[in-house]
UniProtKB/Swiss-Prot annotation:
Protein name (record): Protein HIR1
MF (Gene Ontology): DNA binding; identical protein binding; nucleosome binding; transcription corepressor activity
Chain spans, region Disordered: 532-552
Family designation: Belongs to the WD repeat HIR1 family.
Biased composition (Acidic residues): 538-550
Entry annotated with the keyword Repeat: yes
InterPro entries per the UniProt record, alphabetical: CAF1B_HIR1_beta-prop, HIR1-like, HIRA-like_C, HIRA_B_motif, WD40/YVTN_repeat-like_dom_sf, WD40_repeat_CS, WD40_repeat_dom_sf, WD40_rpt
A Pfam family recorded for this sequence: WD40
Amino acid sequence: MQILKIPWFGHKTENKTVECYAVTINKDGTRLASGGLDGNVKIWDLTTINVFYKMADQPHKSKKDSTSTKLEESLPDKSLRRPLCSMSRHNGVVTSLKFSPDGRWLASGSDDKICLIWEKDNTQIAKSFGTDEHDLEHWTVRKRLVAHDNDIQDICWSPDGNLLVTVGLDRSVIIWNALTFEKIKRYDIHQSMVKGIVFDPANKFFATASDDRTVRIFRYYKKLNEYNNYEFQMEHVVVDPFKKSPLTSYFRRMSWSPDGQHIAVPNATNGPVPSVAIINRGNWGSDISLIGHEAPVEVCSFSPTLFQIADTPANEEIKFQTVVATGGQDRTLAIWSTCNSRPIVVCSDIVDSSITDICWSPDGETLYFSCLDGSITGVKFGARELGQPVKEDLIDQQLNRYGADRESTILPESVEQLQLEEQSKDSRAISIRRMMPIQEAKPEQTPPISTPASAAIDIERLRKQTVTMTKSGKKRVAPLLVSTSAAPKNVLQKPLEKKRRTKSSSKISQAAYLLPKMGVQTTVHGIKKKAESMSNDTEVEENNDNDDIGENVMANTNSVSDAALKRQRNRRKRKLMELKYPSSFKYISNLPEGLFNNHTLQNIEINKIYKAHSKHKDISAEISSSTAVEIDEDLVFSVVFRVFDHMRKENEVLGQTSGRIRTTIEVRNGKPWDDDISDRDFDDATKVIVTEEGNDKREYCLFFPFRVQHVLPIILNDVLKYYVLCSFHGSVQIISADTGSYRCPTFELGESVVTMRHSQGYMLVLTSSGLFYSWDLKAMKVTMTGISIAAILNNYEIGGKIVVSPIVRGLEINPQDGSPLVLLDMTNDIYGYSIDLQCWVKTVDSWYYGVGADKDLDVVLTGLVKKSKMSYEEDKVTEKIFTYKFDSSNDLEDAMRKRGQELLDLI
């Protein structure tokens, strides 16, 4: 193995090196293109570079030695020790470069959001004014592809050269027609920046890698009887190896093995260790990881050649191996083989900065890689050092197992299916001959001349054409054969026609573009087919084709769209949120009010408004499902913050003086933990930080294995005693405020808590299902457990298909025994729970407000009575309730006043 570093082989500006981001080699192995921070695309002559390998083969000798002198004389002239040309048409950093499979085109992507298509121009170009040396070659821009909204990170051509895919930081995957360079599709299905793209050498799939920690496998194939018109489907999403992959890498450049069996994906993790994930074709499993790098891996690249394993026994089938090179932020180049569990060679600190791109020569024995230090380094392996290279015919045989030689829309599910299809051709023909009796040949009869009646029959058939609905909601008319013959139809053709019709209706997408009227331009947005205008449905066109992509081939039979699945998920999520945060408790909880919104009620009201102002009778499901604002629970409670004032006692040991201080509790919730223990990290624990005003140091910092939603300080006689922490699933933990130690074991309520109250040493908790729990914290005893509020919420109003429950307007805790006091919005009555009677009692009846019954009550009950009276007066003004009008005599009014006063005396 030889490592070649040439001082002038790289990117420099004014004797200063600049970052180099991309390298690529053409199919002949004669040209290498590089791009970097200087915005230039440089073309290098590999014939000139390879001469230096020959000089490295010879042993080092003195300068006076004649052999060394001859070698130096055989080196290329100093005027050739530079790039053949340097093109500066980009307005930003060149981040990606790829030669087309035939070597004619060179695609370059940049952070100026533009992809340029270059072609070599053989015409002689005069020397530019102000330049010392003119370019030895001239490359010109043929197309400018404009569609991205942010930096282009990677580019890849399909193996047949008919497709070009670009990905970028705008999370878009844009597919171009590589013949006309029109935009075919744009998919924005990734949730974050897309940093890698690779095509299957069998020309059936391509894969994309994104910062959303997923690798998506796309299947594509040509449509039936349509030239260069493709169908795209989502095949699989790989998640497991990338759950904890870092987001610090600039690239995620993948590579597909030349035999089509494996995908090498960088920036994966195996536990806490950086790794390279190997994805198997077919089941898309990712059980294999290449572990050896000490920092995230940026790029992987398979050698384009298969190598024969030398020690294969003679009586066994010849085995092959593939070789992959990996590099990343640890400045290390590693060469791996599929027949070894350890790397063939590891070159540590081979460069001074991160490795950004790797490319192999067509013979598979020389590689070049770029680096952020601006250099381009070459590595050449000796003859048979990696193994015996196999012929291209054997590689084609390996790819033909996956249908590389087929362009049919009938998709093979496995290699065995392709073999069975070949075997079944002859058997199918034999079985048909056995079923059909041998008949003597008869002279052909002249077909009868069609009559006008047959035309009438055809018109009736045309009127009964089959109309199908695609996933995007568009209507399509199935084509019918218009025959001018009056001969009867063949009965045997009916099942075939039905099968074809079903198959054509399962298509997910159709061509969304035609050739533009003004010719093929740089950027083609396409023109919708005029046949779609026949539909009466108005559609809002988006700048992507996400609705046209399918999940997989088997899912086409179900015809379930992504939008429908998304609506189902949102519907289930809303139901869970309504169960977890009932709208009846939104006024008594200190949680954000948006969590308690009843989405069903909101949608019904919005539907009424929409139908009143719209000409359409039916409201679309998309509008109905998107009316309610969704709240991310994890984002809302990522930090829980409480600040409160209290008295602090004097402590001579700690040097604390008595006085009024302010304490802050900050809860930093970790990520939701998975059920799988192996996926849990200590870094994901919830952190509780307690600080005091005026004290630079923290009082203490606690860690919990659950995510905290509620924080309740317990203050007795103006002195802070305890902190009460409650999780999302009803785990209640009481902590001593002085030391941070546990006061008691964790309470498990089994469901989320809506609100918490405390008074005079009592703590009251209300859960999402309406159950009350109360404890005496002084004696550490329970006062009431699992008391349901349903007894006083049994009044409900039915409106259409929904049930409107009464809203709890106020909630307080009785300081005498810790029982709840509840104010209802519908009746304005105040209820309390009697621990002695073990039932709910009506503490204050709003019916007696009309006669002015009054009494001096305690502070807690007085506040609820004021709220009740204000709501009562508001209902009178809005005529929700009607008060009784007394006669001229005051006997009835006096009797009611006495009865109301009697009820108040019982409190």
